[in-house]
Amino acid sequence: MTIQKLNKNNHLPTTTVIDYENKTDDLRIIWLKKPANFDFTPGQYCTIGKNKIERAYSIASSPHEEFLELFIELVPENDGGVLTPQLWNLKTGDLVTIRPRAKGIFTLKEKHPNQLFVGTVTGIVPYVSIIRNYIHQNKIGHKFYILEGASYFDEFVYDNEFFKLMKSHPELLHFVPTISRPDDIKNSYWNGITGRVNNIIVDQINSLNLSPSNTMVYACGHPGMIEDVKAKVSNLSFEFLEERFWKDD
């Protein structure tokens, strides 16, 4: 999730960049030192800043981890990017401001045994935190179905983590990635499902035998995707929760 803010507070706490990794030319994971007493519920977001420009980012790490993991998409300066170009210049040891409290209501609702998570690229982040925490706490009684859409296969940054969990915890996780540009040369080696994630959701619901009586549906990412998913699952009487964002700047 991203929310634009102009920071007028000169006394915000800061935290340190522990490490970073560029996944593609415009996708980066940044690990920050978690401030003391910084608590959050999986699915929530933190607000960080540089040079008095702030944005909110969903947290990928679990609360038990000693760092905050953020997955960020770059918007170049010539496309109007303001904060993300600064985040791309960060090095290990650099400082960013951080608001002292995490926020957000896009968190796990445990009423239903089946949890259907729909996301696009960085919209997958809240689900990473939720699942890591669920496993860490040795919880049982729920199964998570993740449908992730992207234009290109290299945008599936957490796919290896999900596939490993499918093997080690088949009773817990089912992961379905899909690409929307199968004819692009960048996807020439892709042999998985194709189509926009919002266009395959009904077929996936049917093939997985999910029903409104036992399944909660979540969607995070592109607003257009969310609107379409919401309309389709609401028409089928599923309970639905959303987290909207578009490209940060």
Give, region by region, the residue ranges found by the protein language model.
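Structural motif
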Residues: N114-L116, Y145, M216
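Ser/Thr-glycine-rich phosphate-binding loops at phosphate-binding pockets of nucleotides
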Residues: T120-V125
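FAD-binding FR-type
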Residues: I18, I29-F117, N133, S180, ...
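Reductase modules of NAD(P)H-dependent flavoproteins
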Residues: T2-H11, L147, Y152-D249
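Histidine-anchored nucleotide/phosphate-binding helix
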Residues: P126-Q137
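A short helix->loop->beta-strand "cap" motif at the edges of active sites that frequently abuts
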Residues: G141-H142, F238
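Short N-terminal strand-loop motif that marks the start
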Residues: M1-P35
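Short, flexible hinge/linker loops that cap or flank conserved catalytic cores
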Residues: L108-K111, N138, N209-S211
